[in-house]
Structure formats: structure tokens, C-alpha cells
Amino acid sequence: MTAPLAGLRWGLGPGWLLRLKRCRRSAPWDLGIRSSASRKELLGLFSLNNDILSQSCRNYQAVLCTELTKPLIIRNLPSPSLQPHEVRVGVHYCGVNFADILACKGLYQEKHCLPFTPGMEFSGMVMETGANVSTVQEMLWPIPEGVSYEEAAALPVSYGTAILALDHRARTQPEETVLVTAAAGATGLAAIDVAANVLKAKVIAAAGSDYKCNLALQKGAAHSVNYTQGSLKEGVKKLTDNRGVNVVLDAVGGDIFKEALHSLAWEGRIVVVGFAGGAIPSVPANLLLLKNVSALGVFWGRYREEDFPVFSSSLSSALWHCQERRIQPHVGAVFKLEEVNEAFSRVTQRKSTGKVVISMK
């Protein structure tokens, strides 16, 4: 009997232990078994196969950050014993996120004690369940039929963020105009996908090259602006007949955020999901007043602690929309585990489009 499942945690590797209660950030990039009540916020997708429950791993490979700002290393570690409230997971794919890179530089909001295994999302197979596990509620989600392991690993962080930002926070309505910055990144393409194909909004994509703008158009954006070739604000004004946009999803920060904020229409909403540009901007309160606009934030992982039903719903919705083919995650590159540092460099150097994933197989 096989039942597809999906789950959440932090780490890089093919199989690990997952404690079925809310934990502190841990990582999916362990190539064996991993779980710790001292970590939080891991996302992934699995399928349960009772035919292999007799299998156990004596050792596993794990990606470790042993020194901040230094290359990651891979080590063979002994597998811990399966505890009553844990499941053993064989990981197939892991997603790479900008937050992982920040964590390995010591720049992320949540700090980790060295050494730690980075990572936030994965897909794989449940290999074994602890004696007290009767159902999976807070860490694992079913992978629907027709959704691949590769697609599943690309969904949680990017699409969970996009759904929360555009639907739950900004309350985006059909036919509204949505501006997406960093449009060719993982969250940007997910936001375009959700806005255009689920919420039926009109999307303006903003990116830093013609190639990235063209990719955003292929993925559902109605228009694009290359903000390295002119003013984002002026580009949006031309595309909207000076009306501005109803919603902005910004992952860049800095000057791009400021231009996007000035591009809002009356009663517009700007949702901050990150600061990939490095600079954290301030918000001029007089502009909020004059245009009656709202500035909102989304830290998707925090919802797991503060409002778990909303958190879980965002991931379940992403999986369902993917099964129905309303959305389709864009995997821009696949790396092997031993190429993890190259994968990090691809994201850091802005060479990637969509989601970068690590294959454990």
C-alpha cells in the first residue's frame, strides 16, 4: 500500500527522522535521518510505502555548515534511533532558498548553533513510523497523484509564500493588477503563477534582464518591466495609464521597493516577502496616508507557530492547484548533493531562474 505524503522541516540529505510536533528549525538536506525538537520550519513532500518499513539506515550523509560564510561540507553520520513520535523519511529532492544561504552566513532572522544542516523543504518517502504515530498532521502532507517529487520539492516555500501574500494578506481580486518584483526568481514565478492562473489577476513582472522578463511573460505575466533599463515607476505608469497597480509583491527591497510603493494605485497593497537586494527600506508614512495604501509583510514560516491552519492551508492549496495543473512550478536547475556549494552559488549570483533543487537519487 502506498499513500503519497508531504511534510515540513530543515535539512539536506536522503533520509531522516521527522518529529511529529512543532519543532525548531531543522533541515532536509540530510541524506539519512534527521529530526530535532530544537529546530523549526521544514517543508517537504512524501509517499508512505509499507513495503520498506523493515529497512533501516545505519548511516546517512548530511550537508553541514560548520563555519559561517565557508563552503558547506558533506559528512557520513550515524542514524539515530526512531523515537515513538518520529517518522523515518527517505528524501528524494530538496529545494534551495535564499534564506538557506543567509542562514549559512549568519544573516537570517533565526540563528542556528554550529554545526547545523541548512534547508527548508523536501520531497520523499516515509520509510518507518514510530510506535505512537497514528496520523501525520503538522509535518507531512500527501503528494497528490500526478505531482512529481521534483515538483513537490519546489512548492512549499515559494508557493506557500505567494498564496499567503496574494490571497490571505493582500486579498487580491480577479482583474486587479499585480506587480511582482524579482519576477524570475522562485517566489516571483510562483507569485505570477498564483496571481494569473489561480486568482485571475493581471500581472506586471519586474526583473533585471530581458531574458528574465521574457521568462515571466511565458509563465503568465501580461506585461514586463526591465528595471535595469529605466524607472520601474515610470514603466508601471505607462502600462496602467497612470492608474498604478492594486497589489505589489516585493522580494527585493531597497530602491526597487520604493519605486514599487510609488506605483500603487488608490487603496493599493504592497506585500514585503524579502530583501534579496540586501537593503531594508523604510516606509514613508505620508504616502500611506495620501493614497490610503497598506504596507504588509509575510514571513510564511512564522505562520506555522502563530496560525497553523492558515500555514497548512497554503501548502495544501499549492499541492491541490498543482495536481489540477492550475499552477506549474518552474525548476530552473537540478544539482546533486555533492554539488550543493555550486547550487548555493547559482542562487547567490542571481544566475538561477525559478527553483533550484538538490537531487538525492
Where are each of the predicted segments found?
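Glycine-rich beta-strand-centered segment in the early N-terminal region that forms part
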Residues: 78-96, 107-138
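A short N-terminal beta-strand-loop micro-motif at the entrance of redox/enzyme domains
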Residues: 19, 38, 49-53, 64-93, ...
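Glycine-rich phosphate-binding loop and adjacent beta-alpha segment
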Residues: 199-200, 207, 255-327, 352, ...
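Residues located in well-ordered beta-strands
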Residues: 61, 73, 78, 90, ...
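C-terminal hydrophobic helical "lid"/dimerization subdomain
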Residues: 2, 7, 26, 40, ...
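N-terminal Rossmann-like NAD(P) cofactor-binding module of classical short-chain dehydrogenase/reductase
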Residues: 179, 248-249
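Mid-domain Rossmann-like dinucleotide-binding core that forms the NAD(H)/NADP(H) cofactor-binding site
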Residues: 150-230, 235
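N-terminal mitochondrial targeting presequence
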Residues: 1-60
